[in-house]
Amino acid sequence: MKFFIDTANLDQIREAHDLGVLDGVTTNPSLMAKEGIKGVENQRRHYVEICNIVQGDVSAEVIATDYEGMVREGKELAALNPHIVVKVPCIADGIKAIKHFSGKGIRTNCTLVFSTGQALLAAKAGATYVSPFVGRLDDICEDGVGLVADIVRMYRFYNYPTQVLAASIRSSKHIMECVEAGADVATCPLSAIKGLMNHPLTDAGLKKFLEDYKKVNE
């Protein structure tokens, strides 16, 4: 299981990186806007800054929704750094663009995936990653983790090399459910990654150890 952090915040990326468990970063236009990063050139400089922190894959999303625009933007993004993975929405022109990028050796992350059918098309087109959105499906009373498990089974049955990147993860519980479902990658907020470390018995045990140590060393 790989851990990606889902943010454009450099401080959070550094903190996750310093834990020693970070394998990559995913971003999107909403996350860029949240950090107040405006304009194409500023966003691309920001991607380069992220790549300078993390040695793993960094997903950078195209803004265009037409085939020609996605191909143009994707090539420009891929040229920024070898770690860039071009993030493409799962729409008809997006699938076409993924197929084009696959033939050119440009790695892709097919995003906004909500069904096994979409995941199948992404894999057939040669996507490096496919991103089923767990939390957003849960929001409408559908089974997000179940979709992850279904995609994993499908890919293994047909031997597709596309990696399942569980996205829209809201909690540490989501992470562990996606681990059990067989996801290759979980991309999540820093709070969810740090939440995996927390357990009341760990805190209580450490407190007891320190108290006992002080008693015999006073």
From Swiss-Prot:
The entry's active site is K87
Any one of the GO BP annotations? carbohydrate metabolic process
State its Enzyme Commission number(s): 2.2.1.2
Q: Which SUPFAM superfamilies match?
A: Aldolase
Superkingdom to which the source organism belongs: Bacteria
Query: What does the entry list under GO cellular component?
Result: cytoplasm
Q: Where in the cell is it found?
A: Cytoplasm
**Which Pfam families does UniProt cross-reference here?**
TAL_FSA
**Cystine pairs:** none
Q: Which GO terms describe its molecular function?
A: aldehyde-lyase activity; transaldolase activity
**Main localization category:** cytoplasm
Group of enzyme by EC? transferase
The protein's UniProt keywords, in alphabetical order, are: Cytoplasm, Pentose shunt, Schiff base, Transferase
**Which chemical reaction does it catalyze?**
D-sedoheptulose 7-phosphate + D-glyceraldehyde 3-phosphate = D-erythrose 4-phosphate + beta-D-fructose 6-phosphate
- Keyword flag Cytoplasm: yes
Pathway(s) where this gene product acts: Carbohydrate degradation; pentose phosphate pathway; D-glyceraldehyde 3-phosphate and beta-D-fructose 6-phosphate from D-ribose 5-phosphate and D-xylulose 5-phosphate (non-oxidative stage): step 2/3
PANTHER family reported for this sequence: FRUCTOSE-6-PHOSPHATE ALDOLASE 1-RELATED, TRANSALDOLASE
- Tell me, what does this protein do in biology? Transaldolase is important for the balance of metabolites in the pentose-phosphate pathway.
Q: Could you say which protein family the record assigns here?
A: Belongs to the transaldolase family. Type 3B subfamily.
Q: What is this protein called?
A: Probable transaldolase
Q: Which gene encodes it?
A: tal
